[in-house]
Amino acid sequence: MTTITTTAASPGMRRRAASFLHRHAGVRLSLLLSAPLAWLGLAYLGALAALLVTAFWSTDVFTGDVVKVFTWANFTDLVTGEVYRTVALRSLGVAAAVTLIDLVVAFPMAFAMAKLASPRAQRWLVIAVLTPLWASYLVKAYAWRVMLSSDGLLGWGYGLTATVVTLSYLWLPYMILPIYAGLERLPNSLLDAAGDLGARGWRTFRTVVWPLTFPAAVAGSIFTFSLSLGDYITVKIVGGKTQLIGNVVYDNIGAANNLPFAAAVATVPVVIMLVYLAAVRRTGALENL
Amino acid sequence: MNLSRTSRTLLRAALVAGLAVVYVPLAVVLLNSFNSDRTFSWPPAGFTLRWWSAAWGSAGLRDALWTSVQAGLGATVIALVLGTMAAFAVQRYRFFGRETVSLVIVLPIALPGIVTGIALSNTFHTVLGLPLGLLTVIVGHATFCVVTVYNNVLARLRRMGLNLEEASADLGADTFTTFRLVTFPMMRSALLAGGLLAFALSFDEIIVTTFTAGAGVRTLPIWIFENLFRPNQAPVVNVVAAALILLSVIPIYLAQRLSGGDPQTH
Amino acid sequence: MRSPRPRFARPSLVVTAALALAAVAGCGGGSSPATGGSGAAPGGGAFTPPKIEALKSLGAGEGQVNLVAWAGYAEDGSNDPKVDWVHPFEKATGCTVNTKTAGTSDEMVNLMKTGEYDAVSASGDASLRLIASGTVAPVNTDLVPNYKDVFEGLKLKPWNSVNGVPYGIPHGRGANLLMWRTDTVKPAPDSWGVVFDPASPYKGKVTAYDSPIYIADAALYLMSAKPELGIKDPYALDDKQLQAAVDLLKQQKQNVGEYWSDYTKAVQSFKSGDTAVGTTWQVIANLVEADKAPVETALPKEGSTGWSDTWMVAAKAKHPNCAYKWLDWIISPKANAQVAEWFGEAPSNAKACAETSDKSFCDTYHATDEEYFSKVHYWTTPIAQCLDGRTDVTCTDYSEWTRAWTEIKG
């Protein structure tokens, strides 16, 4: 694209800078990328790398200082200790269960919001879904504790099930919103066309709606999965005597002052999430967040 | 759309039921803020406004609220800038490692909060020797808030296309003017939506904040966490939550209203 | 933080310094104990603290004092306008108080090592580390007039003194008690055996404190239940003894409904009947009773674990005079009564009992009952040097206890 410059005598600094930028896409790109990449790429990834390095160190037992000598001890303990395997699998299970429940609950809701509600109603519905996000996470968890206690509204008691239910509740809006956005983008004409071709409700869903909103659903699942995987607060509030991997990390940092081991344990959810993200990249979910 | 009547009714019912389930615990919170029993037992023992007046008078609460607002605003501003820049880069250009940028931006929110928290804390304190305080909280929050702005702006840019910007350039506006007068107004609502979500994320965040705040900085979630354990203060926490729920409708509503107000792109 | 006891695994927020500062190897004064040989001697039962002089005489106040304290220890009215003993202190002495609230003992140790603070309210585990690393100086108790009224049972204890030299001023104390619902648990138990009973009739309704330090409670029970193990100090456990405690706790887990680490959880649990029996604090018992639930508490015959915090003065305090004034203030009858009531613990000053707003406060908290507290084993961090003086074995340290606790919870 050419810039038609005006016939002003000598373009000022700003004008020169603007034209320079306009002509050199590469410079524009690097300027745009510099700050975000420095922040997230260098700083954040650097912080993660530093943490990983710590996982290979150990703590002096008496002084509590970190001994910066390379050792596999933390990872050996992690891998050989049966309890860590159990806790990791349990956390994985919880995260998967929460994601599944949220998916099943959120989809019909999002569908009704996107396709069956009037535009005006849609706006209010989105507000209705977003508002609970502002009520403190802690208070919501405690409200569930109250409801689940034996003389509460529901009285189901605490434990793993209670944890799954509460986590599903807490992250539901994070699943509804991306799916709603995805369904909104789905043209009604496609659904009509499917109907014209003879597909009824369920068939349309299975062959048209689901494949097209799959990326959005996966996007939502990233949130629910990750938030559940690392959570240590909710399980302390409604989990009874259960513990998840977040608790193991937390206990080792604070109480035991054993950052190297905590870092080693922390690599477990990190690895899981990286694998998950790699798997979902292909589905295009990352664009739907 | 040919959904049978039953399907429609069922779906609508699912929506209503879902929303009801979402709001019941919030109603419990609201009720408990008037509950004269300090430990939230059910059914509520009695009705009292004591907690609401205690909340009003609590200086600790006001400070925590202000700290949270500051942290939220700081994080949102940074997230807006970084997220927009990254979105422009990814959407408008083709370059090596484009997909990785998306991944890296998502990472802070995809990884468990505790990992982000201890990584950042370790870096601040050990590697950089920075004292932990409000600044480190803002940095921590901004890191995972970037993604919300990024996604909103990205989605908007995808819809926007380049036509209007090219037209503006054809008419003689330089890069900066085009951005100011054409691009920015078209993106306003995306920025607002992203910014609002970023603020909400930061406002309610506790895990990363725990690790980046140090001992002196108290955001609202931290204050809540501390006071949930004090028998005399715990009900005040309910008041805070109830107030937040009621008040939050305003900014959300505004954001929704304004989303419809962008200049149309075609 | 209000909840007084869960220093070890309290869901506390300010964990940052703990982890980060621990990772600072050799930063500042971090690893000084080992240098010069005057620090803690590994393998020895006791240790020789570095030679530091206590303040000789009290001068004029410096106008300011920087404290590291547990939440609730230095209230200035910002949480409840009626709960304020800081402003009266500032008025009386002209020393402005700046308090840094810490969440864990580790954090306190690390904060004190920065040299920025003048005084700290240290728990039994932190205090020894502070002494060993030369971070705190001995306290000249002659300069603290109210010290003479402190209960004898708190003076010159293993966690606040070394070789007869006092390193701090006792703040208060409390015991972990056994609580039970009188409508479900019959007959009234008098032993910790009721929570460790494998065939417990209260399956699913037992509660225990959610922290590795609870292992000491199991060890305490084993001291009388299995004397052949030879446990003398529940915080000094060698591998065999630790394993025995762990096995006991794993067995207990079958009957546990919930592990608790904060007030409202425990209170609510007992009130609703979700929990019928288990470890508790006096303040929790008070709240449950105030809300009309039928419970009783007792200090079981085996004794109990407990805690006692100590105010200590930094070796390199920039405001030592104001620090001493604070120490004297916080154990003065009125202030000590106020903090004990706010916090929920027994005051350290005998005269504080006359100043409490609840006249039976001291009785409820057994403040003057030395016999009661003689059965309390105050919290101390387990370290490799056996705290009971044994030199032929290495004892297990807190990080091992934490791993064990993870294993127990499964």
How should these model regions be labeled?
Chain A
Residues 117-120, 150-151, 184-189, 200, ...:
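Juxtamembrane helix-boundary/capping and inter-helix hinge elements in multi-pass membrane proteins
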Residues 19, 70-80:
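A short amphipathic helical element positioned immediately N-terminal to and/or at the very start
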Residues 3-15, 20, 31, 180-191, ...:
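C-terminal transmembrane helix and the adjacent membrane-cytosol boundary/short C-terminal tail
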Residues 63-68, 232-259:
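Glycine-rich helix-loop "coupling/hinge" segments at transmembrane-helix boundaries
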Residues 197-198, 211:
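Glycine/proline-centered hinge or cleavage motifs at structural transition points of membrane proteins
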